[in-house]
């Protein structure tokens, strides 16, 4: 399988913004921490046959480096420090940190090494997997079809929002990791740029080249790693929130809530955290229930919800975003991150439901116990039990 051996990726910045934000925090706070992460396909796709092609792409990634114009652009952003950017200039992907194999038809991928380096593999590697699989499965699909689908959905969107005050509606592209291709994502984002409510992209390469605002703060792995970094498991989520504020005292302040369920998060999200963080991000569970809990929590703490932002990013499409906007827009600031339903929305193309998640930190297990049972990840059942006990979680959800 070498007919598509040309590199999929052309820029080190072809990744999600929060990866660089987290990498800088790891560089400054946890330079010597080691981690392991694993690939998961949440669907029934047997992707093992693509292992050789993916391995070739992994080897090609070692040639990516931060270019001078990219370095200058990052330097102009308000939250990156010179020591980190100078280190990033010298960074190269190390393919020895990645094992890719065909396990009886299933694609098996494991990453391991220093967290400061391993952290950058996830998003571009998922984008590579998605693009390689779609090249083989859907050679007939093209950019024009993706654009036609978007245009049709924008017509529906206009009808759906007719007469609605859209001044508080903000949409972001979160579509890098499961895109049909790099070309499709860029085309979709360029089209969305024409809409007044489109405010940015999570992709740093696109943000730089298209003069867009880069969007993103932190991911589950930030909270997961602290389960072993923090000496007290019950305090690990608060430790993660506090360490983030040390790195970014007054910027990049949207906190992800579902590493150990929303209820457990809110118990840790006291008045100081709630005041200093600019808002919260939803990534699993019922979005209306989650939003109501968030607003009630702010009100209980004496904080005006209108001063905070709720970001919705779980399996969204334009219609769902409008439904949530109608429900919440008068009470809180809102942003919506849409991924797969923008960048892999082509007739007869089945998007991949794929992730890469942390499974170990410093040789010990970590877990994600989200608000959606199917998103729970951990190998070690004893650790899951310890985590549930530490965070007083009432019912068992299957670890996968």
UniProtKB/Swiss-Prot annotation:
GO terms for molecular function: ligase activity, forming carbon-nitrogen bonds; nicotinate phosphoribosyltransferase activity. GO terms for biological process: NAD biosynthetic process; NAD biosynthetic process via the salvage pathway; response to heat. It catalyses: nicotinate + 5-phospho-alpha-D-ribose 1-diphosphate + ATP + H2O = nicotinate beta-D-ribonucleotide + ADP + phosphate + diphosphate. One of its GO terms (cellular component) is cytosol. Transiently phosphorylated on a His residue during the reaction cycle. Phosphorylation strongly increases the affinity for substrates and increases the rate of nicotinate D-ribonucleotide production. Dephosphorylation regenerates the low-affinity form of the enzyme, leading to product release. It is an enzyme of class 6 (ligase). The modification Phosphohistidine is found at residue 220. The keyword DNA damage does not apply. InterPro entries: N/Namide_PRibTrfase (IPR041525), NAPRTase_N (IPR040727), Nic_PRibTrfase (IPR006406), Nic_PRibTrfase-Fam (IPR007229), Nicotinate_pribotase-like_C (IPR036068). Pathway: Cofactor biosynthesis; NAD(+) biosynthesis; nicotinate D-ribonucleotide from nicotinate: step 1/1. It comes from the Bacteria. CDD domains: PncB_like (cd01401). Its EC number is 6.3.4.21. Keywords: Ligase, Phosphoprotein, Pyridine nucleotide biosynthesis. HAMAP family: NAPRTase (MF_00570). Catalyzes the synthesis of beta-nicotinate D-ribonucleotide from nicotinate and 5-phospho-D-ribose 1-phosphate at the expense of ATP. Belongs to the NAPRTase family. This is Nicotinate phosphoribosyltransferase. It comes from Escherichia coli (strain K12). The gene is pncB.
């Amino acid at each position: 399988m070498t007919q598509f051996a040309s590199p999929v990726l052309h820029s080190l910045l072809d990744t999600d913004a929060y990866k660089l934000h987290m990498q800088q925090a790891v560089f400054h706070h946890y330079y010597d921490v080691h981690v392991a992460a694993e690939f998961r396909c949440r669907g029934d796709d047997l992707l093992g046959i693509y292992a050789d092609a993916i391995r070739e792409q992994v080897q090609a990634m070692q040639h990516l480096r931060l270019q001078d114009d990219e370095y200058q652009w990052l330097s102009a952003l308000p939250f990156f420090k010179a020591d980190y950017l100078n280190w990033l200039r010298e960074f190269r992907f190390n393919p020895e940190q990645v094992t890719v194999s065909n396990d009886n038809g299933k694609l098996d991928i494991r990453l391991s090494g220093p967290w400061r380096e391993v952290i950058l593999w996830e998003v571009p590697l998922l984008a590579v997997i998605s693009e390689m699989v779609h090249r083989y499965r859907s050679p007939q699909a093209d950019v024009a079809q993706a654009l036609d689908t978007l245009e049709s959905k924008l017509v529906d969107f206009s009808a759906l929002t007719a007469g609605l005050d859209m001044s508080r509606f903000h949409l972001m592209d979160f579509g890098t990791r499961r895109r049909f291709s790099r070309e499709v994502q860029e085309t979709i984002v360029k089209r969305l740029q024409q809409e007044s409510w489109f405010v940015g992209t999570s992709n740093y390469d696109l943000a730089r080249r298209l003069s867009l605002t880069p969007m993103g703060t932190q991911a589950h792995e930030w909270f997961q790693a602290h389960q072993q970094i923090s000496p007290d498991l019950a305090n690990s989520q608060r430790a993660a929130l506090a360490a983030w504020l040390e790195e970014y005292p007054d910027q990049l302040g949207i906190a992800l809530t579902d590493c150990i369920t929303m209820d457990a998060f809110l118990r840790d999200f006291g008045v100081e955290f709630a005041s200093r963080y600019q808002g919260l991000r939803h990534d699993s569970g019922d979005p209306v229930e989650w939003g109501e809990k968030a607003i009630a929590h702010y009100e209980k703490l004496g904080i005006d919800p209108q001063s905070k932002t709720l970001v919705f990013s779980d399996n969204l499409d334009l219609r769902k975003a409008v439904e949530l906007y109608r429900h919440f827009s008068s009470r809180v600031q809102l942003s919506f991150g849409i991924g797969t339903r923008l960048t892999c929305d082509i007739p007869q193309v089945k998007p991949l439901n794929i992730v890469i998640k942390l499974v170990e930190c410093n040789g010990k297990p970590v877990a994600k116990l989200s608000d959606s049972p199917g998103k729970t990840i951990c190998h070690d059942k004893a650790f899951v039990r310890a985590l549930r006990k530490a965070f007083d979680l009432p019912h068992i959800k299957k670890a996968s």
